[in-house]
């Protein structure tokens, strides 16, 4: 019975503050919309896929060759991000992007037990993301045989005007802003109730003062 009473009391508190519950999420939504469309910069990601195989010798078995390539994938990913590759890419862009900037744009990943490396570049310009990721992949494919014992570096897929917008994600930002607004409104409502020590109901007299109710005066 007490749980039911507490729930009713809780709902009454929320109902009493319904304006705040509606206004604060609306304000957060407007602010988020403004930030998303007018402040937050767009980001575009373009990707390529690269396959690297080790050099074969007459004594190597195909399985051993694949296993060796798999074990070397982590090394290849680090080489792609190394100054040896990125310095050259920076020079080919006539210094438009520094090595540090290129490294900040770059993400290199691979699936477990796969020889395929995915190279991704994220910038604020769709075409530049395409150009940079393609150039990094080409430099890596050209220089890799000189760095390690590989003779077959294949660019499986290049970026051709296929950069994808990755941020800001409008729907996610708007949903989050509404949730934040509701949470803030509820916190403010209950904080206000906790700090309000006024006695407003008969139940408050019994719970806060510990006194029995002898009678009540009706409102006219």
Curated annotation (Swiss-Prot):
It is found in: Cell membrane. It comes from Staphylococcus aureus (strain Mu50 / ATCC 700699). Keywords: Capsule biogenesis/degradation, Cell membrane, Exopolysaccharide synthesis, Membrane, Transmembrane, Transmembrane helix. This is Capsular polysaccharide biosynthesis protein CapA. One of its GO terms (biological process) is capsule polysaccharide biosynthetic process. The keyword Disulfide bond does not apply. It is a multi-pass membrane protein. One of its GO terms (molecular function) is protein tyrosine kinase activity. Belongs to the CpsC/CapA family. Pathway: Capsule biogenesis; capsule polysaccharide biosynthesis.
